[in-house]
């Protein structure tokens, strides 16, 4: 049986403690069985939508959807999929801001199960540790692969990095388009949603806060 990595456990426990974990239940069922159950329910949904499941283009849709849900777009619900994290001692004594911009985000709104997508900017000021740059992208991707709220997603990435890097000096900015607003309801084709999380020096130091805000303004100009 696979076990969670220490980093996955640390992050999950931190989120639970702060009430920031997704509303996930314990379901000790094999992925293959889950996919079979989802496929069965998807057949019922499509039937109720008056779709002909014997048509060539729809015949394998329930199976595709089940596989997509479990293995792809909702794979972040399982901490066994938490990325392997490389934390490196800050031997170079880096004390300036490190920023990764234009991180692609594709997630699913948990209210309507429809996509929202956009870009994230992640900054931190190291203390004793630094993190491999690609690991930041992978953490963002992991938490994006869930039924989500943008506000929660922002806070989850924020707290995960604070926990792994053992520093409060983390800042997150996400700009996203929500298709539950664009493709249904009000049908607003142009609005975007911004969310921000600031910690440590990003919150208390005006010049550092200004530098980060300038970075995201430049990034989105």
Swiss-Prot record:
Q: Enzyme class, one word? A: hydrolase
UniProt GO MF annotations:
GTP binding; GTP cyclohydrolase I activity; zinc ion binding
The family database entries (NCBIfam families) matched by this protein are listed as:
folE, PRK09347.1-1, PRK09347.1-3
State what protein this is by name: GTP cyclohydrolase 1
Describe the reaction catalysed, as an equation. GTP + H2O = 7,8-dihydroneopterin 3'-triphosphate + formate + H(+)
Q: Which UniProt keywords apply?
A: GTP-binding, Hydrolase, Metal-binding, Nucleotide-binding, One-carbon metabolism, Zinc
Origin: domain of life: Bacteria
Q: Which HAMAP family match?
A: FolE
Question: What's this protein's family per the entry?
Answer: Belongs to the GTP cyclohydrolase I family.
């Amino acid at each position: 049986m696979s076990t969670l990595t220490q980093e996955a456990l640390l992050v999950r426990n931190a989120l639970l403690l702060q009430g920031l974990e997704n509303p996930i239940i314990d379901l000790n069922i094999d992925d293959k069985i889950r996919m079979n159950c989802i496929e069965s329910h998807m057949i019922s949904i499509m039937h109720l939508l008056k779709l002909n499941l014997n048509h060539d283009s729809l015949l394998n849709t329930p199976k595709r959807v089940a596989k997509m849900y479990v293995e792809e777009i909702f794979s972040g619900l399982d901490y066994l999929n938490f990325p392997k994290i490389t934390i490196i001692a800050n031997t170079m004594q880096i004390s300036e801001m490190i920023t990764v911009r234009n991180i692609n985000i594709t997630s699913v709104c948990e209210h309507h199960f429809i996509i929202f997508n956009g870009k994230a900017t992640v900054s931190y000021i190291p203390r004793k540790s630094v993190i491999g740059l690609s690991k930041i992208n992978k953490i963002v991707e992991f938490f994006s692969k869930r039924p989500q709220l943008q506000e929660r997603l922002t806070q989850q990435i924020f707290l995960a990095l604070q926990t792994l890097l053992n520093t409060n000096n983390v800042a997150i900015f996400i700009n996203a388009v929500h298709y539950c607003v664009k493709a249904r309801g009000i049908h607003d084709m142009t609005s975007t949603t911004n969310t921000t999380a600031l910690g440590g020096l990003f919150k208390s130091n005006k010049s550092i806060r200004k530098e980060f805000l300038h970075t995201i303004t430049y990034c989105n100009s």
